[in-house]
Regions:
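Acidic, proline/glycine-rich low-complexity IDRs
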Residues: 1-72, 76-82, 88-92, 98-246
Length: 246
């Protein structure tokens, strides 16, 4: 079972605050699972300051068959999320994140254009513990309340949605801690403002049906087509899908 290190965080004028981290055994098993299911990582983006959970990001380089970077969080799943009572016993209370980047992405993450992906991963990873809530399939996140401000100057993408992440065999990714608790992996997929609005009205599955196959592949494409740019949201979903098929 993940332990709480109560002696790791102090700030002047504040009460002691627990940090949720994997044990050494859990961390080793997790790393081995990533190597077997997603790929060998050759870099780790280490978190220098951890007020609540310790979230490192494993970086898996492109290969001949999968020509893109894979970013995988490590540490988010040490915290057991406060899921709704209706799914309390269904194994949705632990999660980790995956994000895929094109092979020419600058991994120094020093500029807005390159670094927003790290900020999104960190933001989502801490949402559950900061808000005493949970994250899961179909949940959306943005950099501002209205999702109107793009992540960077070179894109109009302004929010993200969580989809189920798949392993090398295209099966849904799950990892089990030694205590048998399941950790679900979610793909962080960027959206445009109009796509977020469509999802909020019609749901995740309806939004995904609009995408071409080439854009469903979840590699971040900062210039991809906006699938909801010219859609009238006052129509019902069946009318919209009929219009798109014409």
């Amino acid at each position: 079972m993940s332990f709480i290190n109560k002696a790791n965080y102090f700030m002047k004028g504040m009460k002691e605050k627990p940090i949720y981290v994997y044990t050494k055994e859990e961390e080793t098993k997790y790393e081995n699972y990533i190597k077997d299911s997603i790929g060998e990582f050759d870099k780790v983006y280490h978190e220098l300051y951890s007020p609540d959970i310790h979230v490192d990001i494993l970086i898996i380089p492109p290969t001949e068959t999968q020509n893109y970077y894979k970013l995988v969080t490590m540490g988010m799943g040490a915290y057991k999320m406060n899921v709704p009572d209706i799914i309390k016993d269904q194994g949705y209370d632990r999660a980790e994140l995956v994000m895929y980047l094109p092979p020419d992405w600058n991994l120094k993450f020093k500029t807005e254009e390159d670094g927003w992906v790290i900020r999104q991963l960190k933001l989502i990873a801490r949402t559950a513990i900061e808000e005493n809530s949970w994250v899961g399939f179909g949940h959306t996140f943005s950099g501002d309340a209205e999702a109107t401000i793009p992540f960077a100057n070179n894109t109009k993408l302004s929010s993200t949605i969580l989809l189920y992440a798949l392993d090398k065999e295209y099966e849904q990714l799950h990892f089990h801690l030694p205590n048998k608790d399941r950790i679900n992996f979610y793909q962080v997929f960027p959206l445009y403002k109009e796509e977020l609005e469509y999802k909020q009205k019609y749901g995740t599955e309806a939004l995904m049906r609009l995408f071409d196959d080439k854009d469903i592949i979840p590699i971040v494409n900062i210039n991809r087509k906006n699938y909801c740019e010219n859609i009238e949201l006052d129509k019902n979903n069946d009318e919209i899908e009929e219009d798109l098929e014409r």
